Amino acid sequence: MSLSRVSVTGVRNLHPVTLSPSPRINILYGANGSGKTSVLEAIHLLGIARSFRSSRLLPVIQYVQPSCTVFGQVDLAQGGHSNLGVSRDRQGEFQIRIDGQNARSAAQLAEILPLQLINPDSFRLLEGAPKIRRQFLDWGVFHVEPRFMVTWQRLQKALKQRNSWLRHGTLDAASQAAWDRELCYASDEIDEFRRAYIKALKPVFEQTLSELVELEGLTLSYYRGWDKEKELSTVLASSLHRDQQMGHTQAGPQRADLRLRLGAHNAADILSRGQQKLVVCALRIAQGHLVSQVRRGQCIYLVDDLPSELDDNHRRALCRLLEELRCQVFITCVDQEFLREGWQTETPVALFHVEQGRITQTHDHRE
């Protein structure tokens, strides 16, 4: 799948524009602050209904505009296309449209337009809180396991009920037991989905990493959020008093984590920023491989500031892997000379110059 058309209005400093990107490689180049990252942000908004630069959408709206809007036409892997649209105004109204109909949730966007982001903050996947790694893990599970979303919603509902009575004691014993059973059932299913996903991801990740950098002894493991030797029901019963003191459930899939270690050490503690970025790139490219195997369609990669913290050899290796995925890629850089060359002759490459929010296509992939 790929975006064949993108229209952007009212996003940051960007002038209104309609782009016809290449189905493969798209390079956006220009000076820092010109608006390159805002193009990626607009595509991210279209696919996830969130910005990767701000937790709020109000700053995304151009200061002279009442709202921001992004439309896109997605060419589907199975044939045909789907039209997506998102808009957000200054009063907080947010609208998602899919093929002319209002969508129920952002998950519907994500299902049609799976996106992967690689940017200067990527190292947070290793250094950041477990929540970031759970989001990475569950993105992958969501795209390969059709039952995940329904089970996830059941888990969240049961967890919310249990945490509420832990804080307020509002449920009788029978209701407490019923919600505990529901929580344990949903937790076991989520754990099963995640374990199966990690089992499939690990060999692909290891192979991908070996093509980017040699890090002998790096291991990827999964912690499910409670003792692997015990049933969750047993753990919940034994920790009930402390859970009541804390006001929330301390064990379960909401505490899961991915652990990357180099020998006996946490990988984030001893890898350089450049090495961390390569590890994260390998993880995200491995996810793309799994999506293509299961869905017959590729995810789209948004790569912001590719040269950052990577030398020429590693940049070339990363570009080669992205090209081999045969997916659509949007890459930003200051100087396009390095990225303009080196692609296979049959790979369609489009170049876009971004200057003070204006975007000009300088090389058409159809030429």
UniProtKB/Swiss-Prot annotation:
SUPFAM superfamilies: P-loop containing nucleoside triphosphate hydrolases (SSF52540). InterPro entries: DNA-binding_RecF, DNA-binding_RecF_CS, P-loop_NTPase, RecF/RecN/SMC_N, RecF_2. One of its GO terms (cellular component) is cytoplasm. Gene3D superfamilies: P-loop containing nucleotide triphosphate hydrolases, RecF/RecN/SMC, N-terminal domain. ATP binds at G30, A31, N32, G33, S34, G35, K36, T37. GO terms for molecular function: ATP binding; single-stranded DNA binding. It is found in: Cytoplasm. Pfam families: SMC_N. It comes from the Bacteria. One of its GO terms (biological process) is double-strand break repair. The RecF protein is involved in DNA metabolism; it is required for DNA replication and normal SOS inducibility. RecF binds preferentially to single-stranded, linear DNA. It also seems to bind ATP. Belongs to the RecF family. PANTHER family: DNA REPLICATION AND REPAIR PROTEIN RECF (PTHR32182:SF0). This is DNA replication and repair protein RecF.
